[in-house]
Amino acid sequence: MCYGKCARCIGHSLVGLALLCIAANILLYFPNGETRYASENHLSRFVWFFSGIVGGGLLMLLPAFVLIGLEQDDCCGCCGHENCGKRCAMLSSVLAALIGIAGSGYCVIVAALGLAEGPLCLDSLGQWNYTFASTEGQYLLDTSTWSQCTEPKHIVEWNVSLFSILLALGGIEFILCLIQVINGVLGGICGFCCSRQQQYDC
C-alpha cells in the first residue's frame, strides 16, 4: 500500500470539505440572503462560534496542505537514508491530522449544539428568544411547531439545513483525519512509497 498517495488523496478531500464548511458557515449569517439580522445580532449564538469557518475550515487547511505536499516531501533523511526521512515525514503528518481532528470535532460539537437549541427568532408574542431551547431538540421531529418562529422567514429550515450540513461535513473530516492518523503511523513504521515502482517494506 502506498501510504503517501493515500495521504495526498485525504489532503485533497479535506480542502474541498473545508471550503464547503466555510461556505455553509457564512450562509448562516444571512438568513434569506438578508444582512440586517446579523447587524442587529438576531442570530443564533452558535453562529458566532465560527465552527465552520475556523474549526471545519481554516484549521482543516493546515493538515490538508501538509498531506498534499507529503508525497513530494523528500525530507532530509537521516544517516544518508532518504527512506528514514520519508518515514519521519509520515509520522509528523500524524500531528497535522490531530489538529484536523480537533478542528472537525469543534465543528461537529458546535453544529450539534446549534441544532439542539434551535434558532433565535421572533415569536408570536413579538419577542426575540430561543423558542425551541426547552424542547431538547425534539422540535426537529415536529415540523408543525416551526411556524412559531415568525421572523426571519423560514429561519428554522435555514438553521437546521446549514447546521446539519456542518455536522455532516465535520463528521467526514473527523473520519478522514482519523484515517490519516492510522495511515501516518503505519507509513512511518512500515515504509513510504513514492511511485508504483518504489516501495519500502517493514
Swiss-Prot record:
Keywords: Glycoprotein, Membrane, Transmembrane, Transmembrane helix. Pfam families: L6_membrane. Glycans are attached at N129, N159. InterPro entries: L6_membrane. GO terms for cellular component: membrane. Residues 31-49, 115-161 are extracellular. It is a multi-pass membrane protein. It is found in: Membrane. It comes from the Eukaryota. Residues 1-9, 71-93, 183-202 are cytoplasmic. The chain crosses the membrane at residues 10-30, 50-70, 94-114, 162-182. Present in high molecular weight complexes in tumor cells. Interacts with SDCBP2. Belongs to the L6 tetraspanin family. This is Transmembrane 4 L6 family member 1. It comes from Pongo abelii.
